[in-house]
């Protein structure tokens, strides 16, 4: 992802953080998403119990990692997820083409690659594959490592310290789970399962 960030900078002729701000965050009205937290918003920052002393930048860092480092809110995440659920468009604002979204949410792992360990977890890709930056669920019967339960075609990805999101186009559903610190797998799976149980057939 960091290499992709450099390529974006060169193609766009602007810093990666500025590209995200002008091409994605501002058009989607994501007012609280950036690689830093301004001083006047620090009181709203949730600090993880596993790393309470972590330094949080108050301005754009000199080195940006495209692989991570954004701070955001549930409301902003929802705007982004609504755009993805809208096949690249939110209301009258198009961010990516529907064809690009189809590429993004297709699996590109071979059966052999899916058998490999990932993050030290065996069968990490059991029941799901990997697209362009997102996990993609393809087996309804498997409670898969990243996506958990969900319809085939559900896609999303976890973040640091417990953030997790998913878009299920088949059920027209967005799930956003935000906690800070600790192991979130059990409560996140319970959150998911109850959401699906609430859907009337």
Which residues fall in each region the model found?
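Short, surface-exposed loop or secondary-structure junction motifs
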Residues: 1-152
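Hydrophobic alpha-helical segments
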Residues: 2, 78, 169, 189-192
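Short acidic, gly/pro-rich beta-turn/loop elements at beta-sheet edges
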Residues: 114, 144, 177, 186-187
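A generic secondary-structure signal marking the coil-to-beta-strand transition
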Residues: 130-132, 153, 163, 171-173
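Short, structured beta-strand/loop micro-motifs enriched in basic residues and often containing a Trp
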Residues: 156
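Short, small/polar residue-rich loop motifs at catalytic or cofactor-binding pockets
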Residues: 159-161
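Short, well-ordered beta-strand elements
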Residues: 165-167, 171-181
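Generic C-terminus detector
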Residues: 179-201
């Amino acid at each position: 992802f960091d290499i992709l960030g450099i390529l974006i900078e060169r193609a766009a002729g602007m810093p990666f953080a500025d590209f995200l701000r002008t091409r994605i965050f501002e058009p989607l009205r994501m007012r609280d998403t950036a690689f830093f937290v301004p001083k006047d918003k620090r009181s709203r920052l949730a600090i993880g119990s596993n790393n309470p002393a972590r330094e949080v930048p108050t301005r754009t860092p000199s080195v940006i990692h495209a692989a991570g480092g954004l701070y955001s809110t549930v409301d902003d995440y929802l705007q982004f997820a609504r755009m993805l659920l809208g096949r690249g468009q939110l209301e009258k604002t198009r961010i990516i083409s529907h064809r690009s979204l189809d590429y993004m949410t297709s699996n590109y792992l071979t059966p052999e690659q899916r058998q490999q360990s990932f993050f030290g977890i065996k069968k990490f890709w059991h029941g799901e594959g990997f697209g362009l930056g997102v996990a993609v669920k393809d087996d309804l019967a498997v409670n898969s490592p990243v996506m958990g339960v969900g319809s085939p075609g559900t896609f999303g990805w976890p973040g640091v310290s417990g953030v997790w999101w998913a878009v299920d186009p088949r059920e027209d559903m967005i799930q956003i789970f935000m906690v800070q610190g600790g192991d979130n797998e059990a409560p996140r799976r319970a959150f998911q399962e109850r959401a699906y149980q609430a859907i009337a057939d």
